[in-house]
Amino acid sequence: MATDTYAVEVEGVAKRFGKQPALDGISLRIRRGEVYGLLGPNGAGKTTLIRSLVGLVAPEQGTVTVLGRRMPQLAVLARVGYMTQQAALYPDLSAEENVRFFGAIHGRENGVREALEFVELWDRRTSVVSTLSGGMRTRCSLACALVHKPDLLLLDEPTVGVDPQLRVQLWDGFRKMAAGGTAIVVSSHVMDEAERCDRLGLIRFGKLLAEGTVAEIKSRAGVDRLEDAFLKLSGVSAS
């Protein structure tokens, strides 16, 4: 398959923090137009892997290629949207001002209303971020990540604190973005969230334990539930 089919190519990536391996020889490929889930417990290495995709973490071994360019490459970041676990917002600015600022960074003046409507915050656009609830800040952070219509969208625990009804709507939106060719990487430790992805990478202790569709992973583990598959492939006995 041609390289330009892939939005992300990770080959043998390793990274340690002190003596602790955060990533241990991870290799994976993510296609354009694919929703790919990184599933694992807290501390598994999901965030470190995502940060390596935007050049915030430099691997000690291996290579990271994003949208056909070896990372880190500043020019690539204009085509990438990144939503961190902790909302990276300016608390004294309004929701609209935050989204407009992040759009301007990427040279995009339009799309602010569309992004805020996507996360159902247009009616609160004039609210100062410091007055918003945690869930609303999460949604504002998501709007900032997608306002410039990126080719690759990286979402680190994107629906924490978001109510179930809006979560469904957001996922419908992610699906439409993927259908338009955007590659989306979602990290999560929640099983029902992971089941919405086209393919999954199961991560524990910095290692990629298994990769494939939900059905393929369940079949490989010989179980009916994704949670049981993760435990079995992790070498942990289900109680």
Features from the language model and the residues they span:
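ABC ATPase "signature
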Residues: 211-212
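Helix-to-loop junction immediately C-terminal to a conserved catalytic motif
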Residues: 54
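Conserved ABC ATPase "signature" region
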Residues: 100, 104-124
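Catalytic Walker B motif of ABC-type/P-loop ATPase nucleotide-binding domains
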Residues: 153-157
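Conserved ABC transporter NBD signature motif
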Residues: 62-76
